[in-house]
């Protein structure tokens, strides 16, 4: 049986077809917004072993035996690491965040000891005479006896296996101390699966009563992703071992303490204009003392204390502030440094500082970071340290973000204290605020700064929000610092990538206000996933980019200089009505009460419902004085009404907030389990705004319609009315309309056009997010000539497929040269595709 083969997705039609197809008009004489030359950058955070065990080239895991050290300011209580008991900056509740902490397992992370013809014990303890005060722990080997030919072997398997290459050289460095060990030491690299030795070096016995550094170069004779490093001891005695490092000489640009070249090249392939570092949630820390302290990331890696970070493992900070700045310089991108604003992550502990002394110290920390990158070594202490590290010239630091994902009035106070001082002293730095571009609190913060909204959502959100920025306030430039389609798309399939492409076209169209963007997260070690989707996957010796990687790459490689008029930027398909379902009541980290609940259906019948008719799905519910009360501090509490189901009705009640951080949740169109449907979030987002949100699999998704400012007071009864129809939902409170939202239209086809001045080319970008071929004609105006031949770059395929180590480019763009263009042409786009057409055009 012969397979039918489609040779090309671009098919040109005769002029009689043109007459029947609605034309998309493009006018090159009508110039739109300039496209920001800095629109595409990268964001690096230590998550999913992006750095340690990833971009940072060190092969030894837990090299300083510090993995078990508690996060700063936390204490060990009954098998858990427990945070300080301090008010949360967002809602003033003492959260005392904690996490399971297996102390003994963490001590030996990455290590194992074998006694072969010997009797020995290995213990990680705080050394009596530490190698360095910043890293007080070491491995103690008590070797009681060794038979002839016997040995004690201390082995590190790296981060799920070391990547070794035949012919490559590896710098070995470790420290040993002993009062009574009189034998030699052998260092060996081998394959943990086969046992094959790929290189070794023998160190003769020497006096090691003081900490003694051992160094050598190991030449690998084999290639494996299952490499390991062993230190072999041949005599009895008590031996202390610390800071064991195996570092490939083949790093990006050959830099000492450098980066894994294949992963660095993947970043270069994105053509980034800037890099954001070091985060992310780890900038905030799970507690304030757990934040990233950039000064502790400088100097000899042996002296860097490291820190357990918010994603569940300890970072060595081998890739520190200096290495970040150096990498930016090496590939010609600007540096964006993110520093703590005096508060920890609000969804963890959320503790914060507020005294003048503490806030002045926060400002000084920003100063010192900027001076390290920019300052004059002759006059500045921190610039001198940069010069001493081998870089007397300034680094390309251009942006500084004050905090990460901080919100609410306390952040406003902090920003208003920090920003004016720094902006006055460093007027050429572009400072970034962490609030979203529509946050009403921006009105309380004067100044010329950027804002940084983030979105992690499902494909529908990104398809439906191509026009998100069309009516965005132009008061502050926008940096979309984190975004990704990460819900319901596996580890990142083509559907996710195509939806992101639609969102990118909207940001590009609005580049007069959206100046910068960066996908997040960047990396994932295949052995640890801390976030649902990540742009680049890798293991010890392989890497590949997801389909989203190629969307980013295509977009960055094919930027126009400026946008030009296009008559149609999107095509709306059918409206998806609000579903028939039950209603529900609830809250988010808030205590509240509901009473006098009644529903009037479309036929005019009104039914009142008692508190005991509600099914309590999440939270702690009880009846108090005839009201249904929710008393817990849980998120997304819910009590539904199984007796009701409908899609056209008016829901009325009285609601009162009695405590907590936000307002009310009213659910409609919900399924029986309370997992899918819609919600009215009243006084949400830290009790600042109200909006409608879809619910998917028990999680709220992004807002439909428009958020409006609203604050809910404590101990006040509100009259609440929600009018629901299949096409529209409207919220009234105390007799006044607050906001409304239409049922979402499924928009899946998009077009964006621009002109590349340097190349003299019209750039047409089209997204087809449907599983059907999309055929359109184009009518090009405003150009003297439009070439018949052009370049087509297209990404398409099965929406559910993903790239993998076995098929790393299963989903990757294909570039072809095609004829049949000109001032009028028609073509068809493949199902589920992102296509860029470049045509020479003279103006």
Which stretches of residues belong to each language-model region?
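Extracellular carbohydrate-recognition regions
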Residues: 24-117, 254-280, 565-623
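Aromatic- and acidic-residue-enriched carbohydrate-binding clefts of CAZyme catalytic domains
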Residues: 42, 73-140, 283-321, 348-364, ...
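Extra-cytoplasmic beta-strand recognition segments
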Residues: 61-68, 103, 155-185, 212-219, ...
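Extended acidic/polar, glycine-enriched regions
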Residues: 148-269
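Catalytic-core region of carbohydrate-active enzymes that cleave or remodel glycosidic bonds
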Residues: 326-327, 419-431, 442, 449-558, ...
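Extracellular glycan-recognition regions
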Residues: 571-746
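Carbohydrate-binding surface patches
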Residues: 749-786, 792, 835-836
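Acidic, Ser/Thr/Pro-rich beta/coil linker or hinge segments at domain junctions
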Residues: 785-827
């Amino acid at each position: 049986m012969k397979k039918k083969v489609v040779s090309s997705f671009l098919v040109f039609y005769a002029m009689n077809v043109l007459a029947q197809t609605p034309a998309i008009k493009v006018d090159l004489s009508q110039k739109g917004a300039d496209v920001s030359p800095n629109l595409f950058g990268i964001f690096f955070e230590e998550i999913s072993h992006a750095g340690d065990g990833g971009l940072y080239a060190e092969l030894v895991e837990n090299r300083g035996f510090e993995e078990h050290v508690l996060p700063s300011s936390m204490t060990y209580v009954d098998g858990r690491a427990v945070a300080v008991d301090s008010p949360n900056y967002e809602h003033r509740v003492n959260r005392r965040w904690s996490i399971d902490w297996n102390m003994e397992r963490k001590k030996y992370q990455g290590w194992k000891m074998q006694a072969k013809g010997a009797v020995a014990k290995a213990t990680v303890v705080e050394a009596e005479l530490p190698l360095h005060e910043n890293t007080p722990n070491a491995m103690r080997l008590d070797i009681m006896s060794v038979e002839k030919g016997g040995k004690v072997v201390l082995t590190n398997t790296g981060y799920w296996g070391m990547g070794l290459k035949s012919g490559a050289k590896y710098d070995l460095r470790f420290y040993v101390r002993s009062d009574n060990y009189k034998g030699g030491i052998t260092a060996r690299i081998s394959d943990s699966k086969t046992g094959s030795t790929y290189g070794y070096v023998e160190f003769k016995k020497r006096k090691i009563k003081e900490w003694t550094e051992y160094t050598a170069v190991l030449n690998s004779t084999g290639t494996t992703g299952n490499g390991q490093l062993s230190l072999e001891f041949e005599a009895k005695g008590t031996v202390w071992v610390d800071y064991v490092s195996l570092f490939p000489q083949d790093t990006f640009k050959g830099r000492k303490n450098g980066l894994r070249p294949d992963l660095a090249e993947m970043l270069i392939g994105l053509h980034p204009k800037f890099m954001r570092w070091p985060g992310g949630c780890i900038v905030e820390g799970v507690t304030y003392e757990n934040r990233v302290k950039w000064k502790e990331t400088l100097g000899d890696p042996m002296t860097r204390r490291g820190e357990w970070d918010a994603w569940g493992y300890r970072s060595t900070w081998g890739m520190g502030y200096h290495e970040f700045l150096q990498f930016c310089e090496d590939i010609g991108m600007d540096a964006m440094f993110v520093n703590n604003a005096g508060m920890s992550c609000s969804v963890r502990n959320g503790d914060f500082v507020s005294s003048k002394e503490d806030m002045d110290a926060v400002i000084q920390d920003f100063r010192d970071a900027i001076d390290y990158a920019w300052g004059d070594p002759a006059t500045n202490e921190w610039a001198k340290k940069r010069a001493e590290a081998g870089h007397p010239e300034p680094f390309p630091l251009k942006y500084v973000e004050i905090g990460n994902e901080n919100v609410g009035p306390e952040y406003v106070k902090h920003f208003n204290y920090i920003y004016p001082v720094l902006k006055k002293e460093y007027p050429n730095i572009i400072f970034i605020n962490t609030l979203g571009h529509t946050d009403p609190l921006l009105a309380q913060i004067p100044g010329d700064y950027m804002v940084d909204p983030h979105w992690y959502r499902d494909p529908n959100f990104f398809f439906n929000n191509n026009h998100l920025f069309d009516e965005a306030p132009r008061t502050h430039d926008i940096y979309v610092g984190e975004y990704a389609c990460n819900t319901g798309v596996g580890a990142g399939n083509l559907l996710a990538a195509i939806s992101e492409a639609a969102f990118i076209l909207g940001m590009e169209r609005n580049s007069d206000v959206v100046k910068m963007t960066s996908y997040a997260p960047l990396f994932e070690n295949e052995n640890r996933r801390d976030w649902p989707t990540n742009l680049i996957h890798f293991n010890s010796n392989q890497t590949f980019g997801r389909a989203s990687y190629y969307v980013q790459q295509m977009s960055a490689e094919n930027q126009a200089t400026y946008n030009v008029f296009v008559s149609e930027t999107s095509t709306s398909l059918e409206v998806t009505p609000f579903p028939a379902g039950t209603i529900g009541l609830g809250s988010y980290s808030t205590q509240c009460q509901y009473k006098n609940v009644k529903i009037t259906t479309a036929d005019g019948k009104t039914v009142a419902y008692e508190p005991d008719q509600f099914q309590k799905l999440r939270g702690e519910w009880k009846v108090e004085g005839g009201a249904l009360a929710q008393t817990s501090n849980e998120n997304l509490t819910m009590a539904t009404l199984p007796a009701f189901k409908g899609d056209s009705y008016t829901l009325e009640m009285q609601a009162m907030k009695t405590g907590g951080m936000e307002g009310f949740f009213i659910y409609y169109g919900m399924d029986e389990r309370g997992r899918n449907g819609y919600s009215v979030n009243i006084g949400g987002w830290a009790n600042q705004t109200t909006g409608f949100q879809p619910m998917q699999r028990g999680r709220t998704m992004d807002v439909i319609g428009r958020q409006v400012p609203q604050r809910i007071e404590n101990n006040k009864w509100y009259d609440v009315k929600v009018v629901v129809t299949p096409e529209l939902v409207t919220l009234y409170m105390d007799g006044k309309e607050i906001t409304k939202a239409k049922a979402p239209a499924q928009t899946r086809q998009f077009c964006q056009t621009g002109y590349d001045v340097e190349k003299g080319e019209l750039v047409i970008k089209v997204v087809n997010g449907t599983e059907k071929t999309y055929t359109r004609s184009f009518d090009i105006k405003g150009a003297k000539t439009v070439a018949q031949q052009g370049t087509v770059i297209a990404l398409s395929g099965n929406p559910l497929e993903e790239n993998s180590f076995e098929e790393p480019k299963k989903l990757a763009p294909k570039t072809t040269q095609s004829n049949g263009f000109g001032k009028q042409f028609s073509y068809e786009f493949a199902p589920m595709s992102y296509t860029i057409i470049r045509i020479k055009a003279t103006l």
